[in-house]
Amino acid sequence: MDSAVSTIMTGVENLRIALQDVPGFRTVASAPYMFRPFIMLVFLGIAAGLVGVIVNLRCMEFNAEAMVHSVFPGIVAGALYWGIDNIVPGAAIVAVIVAIALTWLGRSRRINEAGTAIVLISFFGFGIVLSLYKGDMSGQLEALMFGRLLEVSDTRLVQSILVCLIALIAIGVSWRAQISRASARDGAMAAGMNATAVDFLANAAIAAVVVASSSAVGILLVVGYLVV
């Protein structure tokens, strides 16, 4: 993993040096601590832009809101037990569980919203309790919620880029199915579409964007990327 991070960051540093004298890039390319957040925001913007289209077309705003809050315990656990550079893996583990839960709840229109609300409240509440139970989190809790963009490390940048690519793959391979599901839900199911798989890919893509942004933008602000 370390060698892969080193290789990718060497390429990022070479790109930064190449852009130093290019008008419009001089500020962000002036130092590595400025260029890392810039690269992260570029990848996050591309992934969130495409995933956000599906979120709005399929009226999955509440799912996105639930995912944003529900990954919080994974972020807290990753930071407390494995170190700040393991925020993304910790959030990813919880995000997979939440994506499965939201997909299962989405199969029933009757319990969908109520069940989603329960998932949101339960996971987010557990994250708050965990963060307060483990000691003095003054300042740290706010950082986990709203992010610290200029403190992005090489490891977290690479992790976030990889997760953004997962989001793009998940939404890319199911793009046609997602559009069909959005425009004619019942017709798509009558045509033999695997609705559960399509829904899971949509939730997984949302989860990936949330996880990718967790270490920099913060879990609460990413909903603006997906919905607004």
Model-derived segments and spans:
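Hydrophobic core segments of alpha-helical transmembrane domains in multi-pass membrane transport
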Residues: 41-49, 75, 96-100, 125-128, ...
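Transmembrane helix-bundle core of multi-pass membrane transporters
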Residues: 21-27, 109, 116-174, 201-204
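Structural signature of hydrophobic alpha-helical transmembrane segments
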Residues: 33-45, 84-96, 161-165, 211-225
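Helix-coil boundary and interhelical linker segments in multi-pass alpha-helical membrane proteins
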Residues: 27-35, 77-86, 134, 154, ...
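Membrane-interfacial amphipathic/re-entrant helices at transmembrane-helix boundaries
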Residues: 1-46
